[in-house]
Swiss-Prot record:
<dbReference type="GO" id="GO:0000179">
    <property type="term" value="F:rRNA (adenine-N6,N6-)-dimethyltransferase activity"/>
</dbReference>
<dbReference type="GO" id="GO:0016020">
    <property type="term" value="C:membrane"/>
</dbReference>
<keyword id="KW-1133">Transmembrane helix</keyword>
<dbReference type="InterPro" id="IPR020596">
    <property type="entry name" value="rRNA_Ade_Mease_Trfase_CS"/>
</dbReference>
<keyword id="KW-0812">Transmembrane</keyword>
<keyword id="KW-0472">Membrane</keyword>
<dbReference type="InterPro" id="IPR029063">
    <property type="entry name" value="SAM-dependent_MTases_sf"/>
</dbReference>
<dbReference type="Pfam" id="PF13679">
    <property type="entry name" value="Methyltransf_32"/>
</dbReference>
<feature type="transmembrane region" description="Helical">
    <location>
        <begin position="406"/>
        <end position="426"/>
    </location>
</feature>
<keyword id="KW-0175">Coiled coil</keyword>
<dbReference type="InterPro" id="IPR052220">
    <property type="entry name" value="METTL25"/>
</dbReference>
<protein>
    <recommendedName>
        <fullName>Methyltransferase-like protein 25B</fullName>
    </recommendedName>
</protein>
<feature type="coiled-coil region">
    <location>
        <begin position="186"/>
        <end position="210"/>
    </location>
</feature>
<dbReference type="InterPro" id="IPR025714">
    <property type="entry name" value="Methyltranfer_dom"/>
</dbReference>
<comment type="similarity">
    <text>Belongs to the METTL25 family.</text>
</comment>
Length: 475
C-alpha cells in the first residue's frame, strides 16, 4: 500500500498533513467509531451510502483485498466489475495518500527464505528462544541503534520496557554496545538474566570451535534493572550511567521496541527534558492504552486543531495489521467468518440482556468448524448466559449469509486505520520539532512480519545524510 514519507515533508508540510488528517477522520468517523460486533445490532451496513453498498455487496474477500485495500495477489491485474462511485474511490485514494508509507527503503531478499523460523542474518545463538518476528525486529532495530549511537557519540543505550531482553542482549553481546535494560516485571528480568548467561556460554563454545574468530573487546552483558517507568515523572534510574564516562557527562540513547501505550510517551519526555539523552529510537504500539489526556495529543499544533480527538475505538483500530488481513482476504479462508459469528452472537445477547453490550468472549477454538448455533451456545456460556436459550435459527442463518458484507465493512475500517496511526505518530514528530529537536519516522521492519514498523528517530543535532544510512540494511 503506497503512502507518504515523513522525510519528504517540511515542518510546514507536516503541519498541513495534520490538518488534512483531522478533516478526513472527522468525515469518516462513523466507520472508524463502529464496532464490527455490532454489525447487525446497529445495522452498520445501512449506514453506508447506497452507492457504496451496491459497489461492495457481493465482493469476495480476494476482490476486497485487491480493489479496496489495493493489495492484489502476486501477478494479479486489478479489474473492477463495475464503475465505483467517486466518493468511494476518493476514500481509497485519500487513505493511501495521507498515511505514512510502511514500506522500508531497503529491498533485500527475505532473511527467512531458507527457513521460515530462522533468520539467515542472525547467528544461531541469537536466534535461540526468539520467534521469527522478534528475530527480524531485534536485528533491524539493533543495527539502527548501533549506527545512531555511533553518529551521536553515545556512551550508553537504555532499552526501556525490555521484556525478556532479546533486543538488549543482541545490542550488548552482538553489537558491542553498553546497554542498560529497564523492565518492570521481576519475572521477565529474571528470565532475561538466565538467557544472558545461556547466550554467553553459547558464544564461548562457538569461539572454542572457531579459534580464528577473535573477540577483540570484552563482552558486557546488559545491566538489568527492575523498575516501572512512570510516564508522568522523570526516572532517575534511567539516567544513571553504568560507568563513569571518560570525559564529561554520559551521553544516552533511549530505545524501546514496541513500548506500550504511555511508555513511548515517557521516552519522548525523557529525551526532551534531559540533557544527558542525546538520541532516541522508539517503536510504539498499543495506542489504545494512551492516557487521554496526557498521551495524545503532545504537540501544541495538533491540540489546536478542530477534530483532533481520537477516542479509544479509533486508537484501538490503529493497532490492526493491514497487510496480514489483506493476505487473509486473498486466501479467503474460513477464519474470516469469526467477525460475522461474533456479530450474530451479539444479537442473541442483546435480546437476552439488553443492558449487556459488547461483553468480552474468550477465544472459542476452531470457530470455522462450528455451526452458527454451536458457536452461539458456547459464546452464551462464556458471557454467563444460559447456553440453552431458544434460538431463532432462521435469523442466525440470515446473518451468516451476510458474511461478505461484514468482511467488507471491516475492510473499510481497516483501510482508514493507518490514518489514525499516522496522526498519532505525526503528533509526536511535531512535539519534538516544536522544541527544536530533529525527528524523523522511518519504516524499518517488513510490515508483513511486524505491523507497527515505524521507528521514531530523534536527535539534538542534525543528522543530514546519516538518516539514509540508518534505513539501509547491513551487509
Amino acid at each position: 500500500m503506497p503512502g507518504i514519507s515523513a522525510r519528504g515533508l517540511s515542518h510546514e508540510g507536516r503541519k498541513q498533513l495534520a490538518v488534512n488528517l483531522t478533516r478526513v477522520l472527522a468525515l469518516y468517523r462513523s466507520i472508524l467509531d463502529a464496532y464490527i460486533i455490532e454489525f447487525f445490532t446497529d445495522n452498520l451496513w445501512d449506514t453506508l451510502p447506497c452507492s457504496w453498498q451496491e459497489a461492495l455487496d457481493g465482493l469476495k474477500p480476494p476482490q476486497l483485498a485487491t480493489m479496496l485495500l489495493g493489495m492484489p495477489g502476486e501477478g494479479e491485474v486489478v479489474r473492477y466489475r463495475s464503475v465505483w462511485p467517486l466518493t468511494l474511490l476518493a476514500l481509497k485514494s485519500t487513505a493511501c495518500a495521507l498515511a505514512f508509507t510502511r514500506m522500508p527503503g531497503f529491498q533485500t531478499p527475505s532473511e527467512f527464505l531458507e527457513n521460515p523460523s530462522q533468520s539467515s542474518r542472525l547467528t544461531a545463538p541469537f536466534r535461540k528462544h526468539v520467534r521469527p518476528k522478534k528475530q527480524h525486529e531485534i536485528r533491524r532495530l539493533g543495527e539502527l541503534v548501533k549506527k545512531l549511537s555511533d553518529f551521536t557519540g553515545c556512551t550508553q543505550v537504555v532499552d526501556v520496557g525490555s521484556g525478556q531482553g532479546h533486543l538488549s542482549r543482541f545490542m550488548a553481546l552482538g553489537l558491542g554496545l553498553m546497554v542498560k535494560s529497564i523492565e518492570g516485571d521481576q519475572r521477565l528480568v529474571e528470565r532475561a538474566q538466565r538467557l544472558d548467561q545461556e547466550l554467553l556460554q553459547a558464544l564461548e563454545k562457538e569461539e572454542k570451535r572457531n579459534p580464528q574468530v577473535v573477540q577483540t573487546s570484552p563482552r558486557h552483558s546488559p545491566h538489568h534493572v527492575v523498575r516501572w517507568v512512570d510516564p508522568t515523572a522523570l526516572c532517575e534510574e534511567l539516567l544513571l550511567p553504568l560507568e563513569n564516562p571518560c570525559q564529561g557527562r554520559a551521553r544516552l540513547l533511549l530505545t524501546g521496541l514496541h513500548a506500550c501505550g504511555d511508555l513511548s510517551v515517557a521516552l519522548l519526555r525523557h529525551f526532551s527534558c534531559c540533557p544527558e539523552v542525546v538520541a532516541l529510537a522508539s517503536v510504539g504500539c498499543c495506542y489504545m492504552k494512551l492516557s487521554d489526556p496526557g498521551g495524545y495529543p503532545l504537540s501544541q499544533w495538533v491540540a489546536g486543531l478542530p477534530g483532533y480527538e481520537l477516542p479509544y475505538r479509533l486508537r484501538e483500530g490503529a493497532c490492526h495489521a493491514l497487510e496480514e488481513y489483506a493476505e487473509r482476504l486473498q486466501k479467503a479462508g474460513p477464519g474470516l467468518r469469526t467477525h460475522c459469528y461474533r456479530a450474530a452472537l451479539e444479537t442473541v445477547i442483546r435480546r437476552a440482556r439488553p443492558e449487556l453490550r459488547r461483553p468480552g468472549v474468550q477465544g472459542i477454538p476452531r470457530v470455522h468448524e462450528l455451526k452458527i448455533e454451536e458457536y452461539v451456545q458456547r459464546g452464551l456460556q462464556r458471557v454467563g448466559l444460559d447456553p440453552q436459550l431458544p434460538l431463532n435459527l432462521a435469523a442466525l442463518q440470515a446473518h451468516v449469509a451476510q458474511e461478505n458484507r461484514v468482511v467488507a465493512f471491516f475492510s473499510l475500517a481497516l483501510l482508514l486505520a493507518p490514518l489514525v496511526e499516522t496522526l498519532i505518530l505525526l503528533d509526536r514528530l511535531l512535539y519534538l520539532q516544536e522544541q527544536g529537536f530533529h525527528a524523523e519516522l522511518l519504516p524499518i521492519f517488513s510490515p508483513e512480519l511486524s505491523p507497527r514498523n515505524l521507528v521514531l528517530v530523534a536527535t539534538k543535532m542534525p543528522l543530514g545524510q546519516a538518516l539514509s544510512v540508518l534505513e539501509t540494511e547491513d551487509s
